């Protein structure tokens, strides 16, 4: 999965680079035309929105309720076990530090 994210990131940066290079516009007044940074930022936000909606659509398409329930169940069991053992460890540590009194 890491290679997919890296590939998507490289492609997005490549498209942004091509868009910035290919946008040769005649010089206009600085006050009327947005700066290059603003154009790049707007372009990035546009691509980010498209990628975000595509990822959300893919997530909704592949969402499995049984897997979600299993993950929640495993999380609940593991947090209960960790809190139990953390309590035992804390009690042991306090009794070692306090000593016999």
Swiss-Prot record:
Gene Ontology biological process terms, A to Z: lipid catabolic process; lipid transport; positive regulation of phospholipid catabolic process
Cystine connections: none
Superkingdom of the organism of origin: Eukaryota
Key word Cell wall biogenesis/degradation present: no
Region (Lipid binding): 66-74
Keywords: Chylomicron, Glycoprotein, HDL, LDL, Lipid degradation, Lipid metabolism, Lipid transport, Lipoprotein, Secreted, Sialic acid, Signal, Transport, VLDL
Record-linked InterPro entries: Apo-CII, ApoC-II_dom_sf
UniProt keyword Signal, yes or no: yes
GO MF entries: phospholipase activator activity; phospholipase binding
Localization per Swiss-Prot or TrEMBL: Secreted
Residue ranges, annotated region (Lipoprotein lipase cofactor): 78-101
Post-translational modification: Proapolipoprotein C-II is synthesized as a sialic acid containing glycoprotein which is subsequently desialylated prior to its proteolytic processing.
Signal peptide stretch: 1-22
Gene3D superfamilies in alphabetical order: Apolipoprotein C-II
GO CC annotations, alphabetized: chylomicron; high-density lipoprotein particle; low-density lipoprotein particle; very-low-density lipoprotein particle
Principal location listed in the UniProt entry: secreted
Annotated function: Component of chylomicrons, very low-density lipoproteins (VLDL), low-density lipoproteins (LDL), and high-density lipoproteins (HDL) in plasma. Plays an important role in lipoprotein metabolism as an activator of lipoprotein lipase. Both proapolipoprotein C-II and apolipoprotein C-II can activate lipoprotein lipase.
PANTHER family, per the entry: APOLIPOPROTEIN C-II
Similarity field: Belongs to the apolipoprotein C2 family.
Protein name as catalogued: Apolipoprotein C-II
Organism: Mirounga angustirostris
Organism ancestry: Eukaryota, Metazoa, Chordata, Craniata, Vertebrata
Gene name in the database record: APOC2
